[in-house]
UniProtKB/Swiss-Prot annotation:
UniProt main location, coarse: cytoplasm
Keywords from the named record: ATP-binding, Cytoplasm, Disulfide bond, Nucleotide-binding, RNA-binding, Transferase, tRNA processing, tRNA-binding
EC number(s) stated in the UniProt entry for this protein: 2.8.1.13
Region annotation Interaction with tRNA: where it falls in the sequence: 146-148, 308-309
UniProt-annotated location(s): Cytoplasm
Protein name in the entry: tRNA-specific 2-thiouridylase MnmA
GO terms of biological process kind: tRNA wobble position uridine thiolation
Listed GO CC annotations: cytoplasm
């Protein structure tokens, strides 16, 4: 029997529940831990943390494992949410899930688990950890449609050395099948979507409570005024919905897309047509780099990159590499490259790391 102690982050969802189940079957001393990362407006209408905790508790009872609830909302506000607001205020579109993983789920949670005497932590992420000669690699999850390595690229060697991903080798359908077979009550529970602290709440309504609104003009690239925006923070590159632009006399009937923002003049730029050249970029610049091995990848080697979750891998090369910034060139132009989002670099199934997109050409 393997009596190593592992603390499993249990969200109330099927993935983390099956992760706990598998570890228990493998003989680990399993402790469940439910993380509460957000306090404000935790109402039934928009946020389901109370229901999620009850689901996690129900599974813990069935598995006969202890479940602890811990509140990381102060850490979340300081390390994740404050940066989220600052990025939006600067006109960028951040991905808080990336920071939540590196700062909360694999830092605050890991520290707490170690204080409980844990040897390992585990989560229900679709990813895998391999150790080769004392180096820990982060690999894509086996289920390509659910792979979550994109959100985990900021993890370091110390974090990965303590991490188990029990369902990383499984497909989602297999996870649900295991949950159903063992009578877990959340076997058919819907996957959570959206940003964790916003829940199902309308995004503009949420952001408007924290940042001042500054409406302005919407321009075409040749300077024609075609509408008014509600505040640059509400829009992201490539956005089509919610622009409120009607038909232009003698103009094209193709849909409008956001192509850029000018924070100095408070102008939102739009173009018509999904394949407009202004929406395509052949290279990007990234900063705040994080490399899983601790060392940067080779310049000029052919790698693959994702500039958004679930994107098909795009062949690329690192054409300039400095201490904390790099330029990445693509074999084919990429659509909707968005400042504030993460670019993540892969070598086959191995996630090497990445950075935050700052610019593109």
């Amino acid at each position: 029997m393997n009596k190593s102690r592992v603390v499993v982050g249990m969200s109330g969802g099927v993935d983390s529940s099956v992760a706990a189940l598998l570890l228990k079957q493998q003989g680990y001393d399993v402790i469940g831990l439910f993380m509460k990362n957000w306090e404000d407006d935790d109402t039934d209408e928009y946020c389901s943390s109370r229901k999620d905790f009850l689901d996690a508790a129900s599974v813990a009872d069935i598995l006969d494992i202890p479940l602890e609830a811990v509140n990381f909302s102060a850490e979340y506000r300081e390390r994740v949410f404050s940066l989220f607001l600052a990025e939006y205020q600067a006109g960028r579109t951040p991905n808080p899930d990336v920071l939540c993983n590196s700062e909360i789920k694999f830092k605050a949670f890991l520290d707490h688990a170690l204080a409980l005497g844990a040897d390992w932590i585990a989560t229900g992420h679709y990813a895998q950890v391999h150790e080769i000669n004392g180096q820990f690699q982060l690999l894509k999850g086996e289920d390509g449609n659910k792979d979550q390595s994109y959100f985990l690229y900021r993890l370091n060697q110390q974090q990965l050395s303590r991490t188990i991903f029990p369902i990383g080798h499984l497909y989602k359908r297999e996870v649900r099948k295991i949950a159903h077979k063992h009578g877990l009550p959340n076997s058919t529970k819907k996957d959570s979507t959206g940003i964790c602290f916003i829940g199902e709440r309308p995004f503009r309504e949420f952001l408007n409570r924290y940042l001042p609104v500054d409406p302005g003009e919407i321009h075409t690239l040749d300077g024609q005024i075609v509408g008014e925006h509600q505040g640059l923070m509400y829009y992201t590159i490539g956005q089509r919905q919610g622009l409120g632009i009607g038909g232009i006399r003698e103009g094209s009937e193709q849909p409008w897309f956001v192509s850029g923002k000018d924070m100095q003049t408070n102008v939102l730029y739009v173009v018509q047509g999904h394949d407009h050249p202004a929406l395509l970029r052949s290279s990007l610049t990234a900063a705040d780099l994080s490399w899983i091995s601790g060392a940067p990848p080779h310049q000029s080697w052919v790698y693959a990159a994702k500039i958004r979750y679930r994107q098909t891998d795009a062949p690329c090369a690192i054409i300039r590499l400095e201490h904390d910034s790099c330029q990445i060139g693509f074999a084919a132009p990429q659509w909707g490259v968005t400042p504030g989002q993460s670019v993540v670099i892969y070598e086959s199934k191995v996630c090497l790391g990445g950075g935050i997109i700052t610019d593109s050409v």
